[in-house]
Amino acid sequence: MNKEILAVVEAVSNEKALPREKIFEALESALATATKKKYEQEIDVRVQIDRKSGDFDTFRRWLVVDEVTQPTKEITLEAARYEDESLNLGDYVEDQIESVTFDRITTQTAKQVIVQKVREAERAMVVDQFREHEGEIITGVVKKVNRDNISLDLGNNAEAVILREDMLPRENFRPGDRVRGVLYSVRPEARGAQLFVTRSKPEMLIELFRIEVPEIGEEVIEIKAAARDPGSRAKIAVKTNDKRIDPVGACVGMRGARVQAVSTELGGERIDIVLWDDNPAQFVINAMAPADVASIVVDEDKHTMDIAVEAGNLAQAIGRNGQNVRLASQLSGWELNVMTVDDLQAKHQAEAHAAIDTFTKYLDIDEDFATVLVEEGFSTLEELAYVPMKELLEIEGLDEPTVEALRERAKNALATIAQAQEESLGDNKPADDLLNLEGVDRDLAFKLAARGVCTLEDLAEQGIDDLADIEGLTDEKAGALIMAARNICWFGDEA
């Protein structure tokens, strides 16, 4: 028998290119399983094979626990120490028992367990082999094409999957085609796909530029951000760590060779290379190219920017189906509102008039004083109530007592408005989890509550169309808030 075990280990190890120790472990598990089937009760068995001789011993064992719930597999600490005083909780008490002989049933059981363990070992090796390549471009040959995905043969018994959403639109592959993509996920699953590859995520664009532009690999040029409408258009932001080098020109290449190579790999995707700037407003101006920006107004509190362009440039600035401004927004991380110069001016005039009306109504001041506050950049009661006092004292003609009185009136007004809101809502008040969601201020929370959206769970069940006409809430922001709520409520992400 010992020679048979050693022969099996050697044969399987060579055939599957697996370490001998993995095969020994699989055999031990198989023999333990076969032994358990000889007993009517459920027991715990351990088999130990001598790695040199092939001989094996079998042990029945009991886990040392505080309270026994499975008498055939567990033993109390007191009883265990009766035999061995050195034992502790979590240790095992073992008795050697008769080892199984290899009859037909035992052989079949052992074979099934070995096959399963070998398969698990092969899958573990694939995970170990590719985990260090996560985030890199890999190449495979199309093995099978399904409706929802394609399978890639990567060699060495490794397969990857490209899901339909990770392909470019109108991209079709046939068995035998060579395909490149970024390995974005390595999952140690017991069944199904383990390696997931994408061609549509921004990481694919970044890695292709890393291959085509040596300066990126040398860290002379740095890719700061990327945004894609896969297969159609993309924007990538670059900066240089060496002022002698033009990062945009280096990425474009001689006669556009470098950017063209990337574009060709991505099905002719048009790529805008944008110069990174640490100033968010200037970076957004760069990202809006090829459109020329006439002026830009930044609202840091709401993390939005109003972008004004000449009327003749409006269509170009927005792009087909909003593509240009959407990509610029994704690239910069800011919510961008594009309009004509006249529209921006009219918007700011309307906002100024609204702020003046609010100040005169709630602060008991005249229109001239309210106008001065607006011209100095104050537009809400919250700003007047909570900005540092020194900012208000910088306004000509205001002294400390006046500022104190103004701040006190603003705080009282906010309290009055909040109380009125709560009374008007009745029982429909925003819950703490909604108020604490990033991106939801108190005003928006009460607007949502007025629609019956009072909790994160309520928000998670909404669609963008359900929130479309809430003042100050864009479709993009509504979608982001809904997804954030779903991630927390449905998938257990932290707020």
Swiss-Prot record:
Its main location: cytoplasm. Residues 427-495 are annotated as: Acidic repeat 2 (AR2), required for interaction with SuhB, interacts with RNAP subunit alpha (rpoA), NusG. It comes from the Bacteria. It is found in: Cytoplasm. Monomer. Binds directly to the core enzyme of the DNA-dependent RNA polymerase (RNAP). Interacts with nascent RNA. Interacts with the termination Rho factor. Interacts with the phage lambda N protein. Interacts with SuhB via the AR2 domain, crystallizes as a 2:1 SuhB:NusA heterotrimer. The rRNA transcription and antitermination complex (rrnTAC) consists of RNAP, NusA, NusB, NusE (rpsJ), NusG, SubB, ribosomal protein S4, DNA and precursor rRNA; S4 is more flexible than other subunits. NusG and the alpha-CTD of RNAP interact with the AR2 domain. (Microbial infection) Interacts (via N-terminus and AR2 domain) with Escherichia phage lambda antitermination protein Q; this interaction (AR2 domain) releases the autoinhibition of NusA. Sequence repeats lie at residues 364-414, 439-489. Residues 364-489 are annotated as: 2 X 51 AA approximate repeats. Residues 230-293, 302-368 form the KH domain. CDD domains: KH-II_NusA_rpt1, KH-II_NusA_rpt2, S1_NusA. Induction: In response to low temperature. Negatively autoregulated. Induced by cold shock (42 to 15 degrees Celsius) (at protein level). This is Transcription termination/antitermination protein NusA. GO terms for cellular component: cytosol; transcription elongation factor complex. The keyword Metal-binding does not apply. GO terms for biological process: DNA-templated transcription termination; protein complex oligomerization; regulation of DNA-templated transcription elongation; ribosome biogenesis; transcription antitermination. Disruption phenotype: Mutants are sensitive to DNA-damaging agents. One of its GO terms (molecular function) is RNA binding. Residues 345-426 are annotated as: Acidic repeat 1 (AR1). Belongs to the NusA family. Keywords: Cytoplasm, Host-virus interaction, Repeat, Ribosome biogenesis, RNA-binding, Stress response, Transcription, Transcription antitermination, Transcription regulation, Transcription termination. Part of the processive rRNA transcription and antitermination complex (rrnTAC). The complex forms an RNA-chaperone ring around the RNA exit tunnel of RNA polymerase (RNAP). It supports rapid transcription and antitermination of rRNA operons, cotranscriptional rRNA folding, and annealing of distal rRNA regions to allow correct ribosome biogenesis. Participates in both transcription termination and antitermination. Involved in a variety of cellular termination and antitermination processes, such as Rho-dependent transcriptional termination and intrinsic termination. The N-terminal region interacts with RNAP. The central region is composed of 3 RNA binding domains, S1, KH 1 and KH 2. The C-terminal region contains 2 acidic repeats, AR1 and AR2, which bind to protein N from phage lambda during antitermination. AR2 interacts with SuhB and RNAP alpha subunit C-terminal domain (rpoA); AR2 cannot bind to both simultaneously. SuhB, NusG and the alpha-CTD of RNAP all interact with the AR2 domain and can displace the AR2 domain from the SSK domain (S1, KH1 and KH2) of NusA. The keyword RNA-binding applies. Residues 135-200 form the S1 motif domain. Residues 1-137 are annotated as: N-terminal domain (NTD) interacts with RNAP.
